[in-house]
Every structure is written in structure tokens, then in C-alpha cells.
């Protein structure tokens, strides 16, 4: 007899975001389809990336303690397998180039559009 109560684990998304209201918006968009872990700065994000083994990271560029680019570089020193999608309210071409050079998998601008965000996550999680 099969157990109908078993379900697949939802993918775990690490959200590195220092502004609580921005995290709450992402939570509203993502919580039905994903388990979420919140890092409030880059240092926490690096710690959680290797302690909690998320399936993907959604990372703000402008954060205290360690910014998103430095955090991405730290993650990339240890793995290139973890998908990292950078997000910023400052959509400068230099930010995009710097993030790509550091090894990000995608780049989205704030305010985040739910369809665009889910498209990126689906691309790297399926």
C-alpha cells in the first residue's frame, strides 16, 4: 500500500537580502513553491550556503557586512554548482558585468517581477 501523504521536498532557496520588506515580498511570491531561508547580510549568506545546502541563492548586490559580489566570489571559491541569481534596485551595466564576471547565473532588477523570478528559478531547479 502506498503512502499518499508523502510528498517531494520543496526546493530550498537562500534569499540574501538586508531589507525586511524586500524579503517579505519575495516570501509572498515564492513560499508556496519553495522553502525559504533568509540571510540578512553576505556573511550569513556564505555560512548558510554551505551549512544548509540550498538549491539556489537569490542575492541582493547591496548588503552590509559583505556585499553580494563579494559573497558570490566567496561561494564560487568553493562551488560553481550552486545557482546564484543576483538582484538589485540599481540596474547599472557595471553591476551586471561585475556579477557575471564573479560567476552569477542570472541577474534581475527590483522591483522583482514574479514571472521573471520564477522563470529564472525554474531554469536552474528543473
Model-identified regions with their sequence ranges:
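Receiver (REC) domain active-site loop signature in two-component systems and cognate sites
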Residues: 63
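Acidic catalytic/metal-coordinating carboxylates
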Residues: 18, 41-44, 67-73
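Two-component/phosphorelay signaling modules centered on CheY-like receiver
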Residues: 19-37
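As written
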Residues: 68, 100-105
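C-terminal output helix
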Residues: 112-121
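Acidic, metal-coordinating helix/loop segments flanking the phosphotransfer/catalytic sites
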Residues: 38-56, 77
Amino acid at each position: 500500500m502506498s503512502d499518499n501523504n508523502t510528498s517531494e521536498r520543496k526546493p530550498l532557496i537562500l534569499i540574501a537580502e538586508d531589507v525586511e520588506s524586500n524579503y517579505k515580498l519575495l516570501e509572498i511570491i515564492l513560499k508556496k513553491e519553495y522553502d525559504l531561508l533568509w540571510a540578512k547580510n553576505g556573511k550569513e549568506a556564505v555560512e548558510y550556503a554551505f551549512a544548509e545546502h540550498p538549491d539556489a541563492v537569490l542575492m541582493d548586490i547591496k548588503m552590509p557586512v559583505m556585499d553580494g559580489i563579494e559573497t558570490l566570489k566567496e561561494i564560487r571559491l568553493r562551488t560553481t554548482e550552486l545557482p546564484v541569481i543576483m538582484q538589485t534596485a540599481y540596474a547599472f551595466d557595471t553591476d551586471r558585468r561585475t556579477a557575471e564576471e564573479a560567476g552569477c547565473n542570472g541577474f534581475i532588477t527590483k522591483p522583482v517581477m514574479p514571472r521573471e523570478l520564477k522563470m529564472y528559478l525554474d531554469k536552474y531547479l528543473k
